[in-house]
Regions:
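Outer-membrane beta-barrel porins/channels
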Residues: 25-40, 105-439
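Bacterial N-terminal signal peptides
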Residues: 10-21
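A generic hydrophobic-helix recognition signal that picks specific residues
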Residues: 45, 52, 222-224
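Outer-membrane beta-barrel translocator/receptor signature
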Residues: 50-58, 63-145
C-alpha cells in the first residue's frame, strides 16, 4: 500500500513540476548548479552533505540521514545571453549583427520529501529540472530577401542562423526521483532512485537547415513536442568519524523517446540525458564549520544530439543528414568535469551561513565544428553562491540563497558564413528561497 501511494505521488509531482518549471539555467553544461536550497547555497557540493531531503537529485544514499522532512524550493533565474557575428563579407555582410535573448526571467520550483520507515530504511521523493538551452533571438539582418531558404521564408530578412522570424530553442527536462535508502551498517548507507523523466523541446527560426535534413518538415517551427524517459541513480554515503563523511553517486544515461516533431533536427531524433557521476567529501575542521568538496563528471559525448559536430550535415548532407545518427549536433564533444567547493558555518543555533564555488571547462571547442550551434546554446562554466538558513521557533527552516553564473567569452569561426566570427558570453543571476519542515 505504501509503495502504491509512493508511486502515485511520483506521478502527481511530475505533472506539477512540468506545469510550473519550464527553464533551468546551467552550472555544468545544461545541468543545474545544484538541486534544493542547500545545494544552491553550496554550489552543488553536496554528494557527502546530508542537510535536506533532495538526496534523489544528488546521492540517494544520503536519505538515510534526512529523517522525516518536507522541502519546498523556488528559484528565480535571470539569464542573459547575447550573440554577435562580425567579419562576414560580400552578400553575407548583412549578417554582421548582434542579438540579445528575450528569455530573461524564469521561476523554477522544486520539491522533496523524506520518511524514515525504520532504523535501516528510508524512502522519499525529489522533483527537479534541467534546462538552460532556452533562447529567443528576435533580431534579423533587416534586409529583405536575405534568408537562406526562400522556399520557406519568401523575401523575409534573415535571422542570426539564416532562417526567418524569431530564432530560438526551448528545452526542459523534468525529473521525479522516488528514492530508497538502506543503512546496512552504522553510518553506512546505499541508495537507489529511478529517474522518471518528462522532456519538452521546441525550435524555431531554423529554416536554413531544412534542406540538409532527412526529414525537412520536422526541423523547425512545429510547436512544443514531448518525450518520456527513464534511468537510475545509485549512491553510497558513509560517516567515518564525527568530522568526516564521504559519498559517491552514479546516474545512468536517461533514455528518452524520440521527438516526432523534430526528428529531422536532433541527431537520432532524441535528446537523452547523459550519464554522470560524482564523488564528494565533507569535513568538520572545528565546531560549527563544514567544508565540502565534490568532483562531478558529465558524459556529454554519449549523447549524439549534443556531441556530434556541426559540420557533418553542412558539408555532406547526403551522407550525414540532420536527424540521422551522424547528423550535426551542438558540438559538445568533450565530457565535462566540474569541481565544487562549499563552506558552511553555524553562526548561532538559529542561523547557518553557506557559500560555494564551482568550475567546469566548457564541453565544446572554439572551432569550426562547434561554434555556430554552440553560440546558440552556450552556458556558464563557473558559479559562485552565498546563502543562509534561519531556524524558526516553531522548528521549520527558512532558506535564502543567491548565485551568479558566468563564463568566458565563447568565440570562433562561423560554419554558416565563411570568414565570419561568432561569439557569445552568457551570465545569469539566481535567487533561491525555500522552506523546510520536520514531519
Amino acid at each position: 500500500m505504501m509503495l502504491k501511494k509512493w508511486l502515485r505521488c511520483s506521478s502527481c509531482v511530475l505533472l506539477v513540476v512540468f506545469a510550473l518549471a519550464a527553464h533551468v539555467y546551467a552550472g555544468g553544461g545544461y545541468f543545474a548548479m545544484g538541486y534544493g536550497p542547500i545545494a544552491w547555497q553550496l554550489a552543488g557540493a553536496v554528494t557527502a552533505v546530508s542537510e535536506d531531503a533532495f538526496a534523489g537529485a544528488s546521492n540517494p544514499a544520503k536519505l538515510s540521514m534526512a529523517g522525516n522532512q518536507l522541502d519546498l524550493s523556488l528559484t528565480l533565474l535571470n539569464p542573459n545571453r547575447k550573440v554577435e557575428r562580425t567579419g562576414a563579407s560580400g552578400p553575407a555582410s548583412g549578417y554582421n549583427f548582434s542579438s540579445t535573448s528575450a528569455n530573461s526571467l524564469f521561476l523554477v520550483p522544486e520539491f522533496a520529501y523524506s520518511r524514515q520507515v525504520n532504523e535501516q530504511v528510508a524512502i522519499g521523493i525529489s522533483a527537479y529540472a534541467n534546462g538552460g538551452m532556452n533562447i529567443e533571438y528576435g533580431d534579423s539582418s533587416g534586409i529583405p530577401a536575405t534568408n537562406l531558404n526562400p522556399a520557406l521564408c519568401g523575401t523575409k530578412p534573415g535571422n542570426f542562423a539564416g532562417g526567418c522570424g524569431k530564432l530560438g530553442f526551448d528545452m526542459g527536462q523534468f525529473i521525479v526521483a522516488p528514492t530508497l535508502a538502506w543503512q546496512f551498517a552504522p553510518g553506512q548507507s546505499l541508495g537507489i532512485s529511478p529517474l522518471l523523466t518528462l522532456q519538452m523541446f521546441k525550435a524555431y527560426g531554423l529554416q536554413a537547415f531544412a534542406p540538409s535534413s532527412r526529414s525537412p518538415r520536422h526541423v523547425t517551427n512545429n510547436g512544443q513536442d514531448y518525450a518520456f524517459g527513464a534511468g537510475v541513480r545509485v549512491g553510497w554515503f558513509g560517516e567515518f568519524k564525527p568530522c568526516l563523511s564521504l559519498g559517491a553517486a552514479y546516474s545512468s544515461k536517461v533514455y528518452m523517446q524520440d521527438f516526432d516533431k523534430y526528428k529531422g533536427l536532433l541527431a537520432e531524433g532524441s535528446f537523452d540525458i547523459p550519464a554522470n557521476y560524482s564523488v564528494g567529501m565533507a569535513i568538520k575542521p572545528r565546531h560549527g564549520w563544514l567544508l565540502a568538496f565534490d568532483i562531478q563528471r558529465i558524459e556529454f559525448s554519449g549523447v549524439r544530439a549534443l556531441s556530434n559536430g556541426i559540420l557533418p550535415s553542412l558539408t555532406n548532407p547526403v551522407a550525414n543528414p540532420l536527424g540521422s545518427k551522424s547528423g550535426s549536433g551542438f558540438g559538445w564533444q568533450r565530457d565535462q568535469t566540474n569541481y565544487k567547493l562549499g563552506v558552511m558555518y553555524q553562526a548561532t543555533p538559529q542561523l547557518t551561513l553557506r557559500a560555494g564555488y564551482t568550475y567546469g571547462k566548457r564541453a565544446n571547442d572554439n572551432d569550426l565544428n562547434s561554434v555556430s550551434f554552440g553560440v546558440l546554446a552556450v552556458n556558464p562554466i563557473r558559479a559562485a553562491s552565498v546563502g543562509m538558513t534561519w531556524k524558526t521557533d516553531s522548528g521549520s527552516e527558512l532558506h535564502m540563497g543567491f548565485a551568479r553564473m558566468d563564463g568566458a567569452k565563447y568565440k570562433g569561426p562561423s560554419a554558416i558564413f565563411p570568414g565570419a566570427k561568432e561569439s557569445a558570453r552568457p551570465y545569469a543571476y539566481a535567487v533561491n528561497i525555500a522552506w523546510s519542515q520536520a514531519m
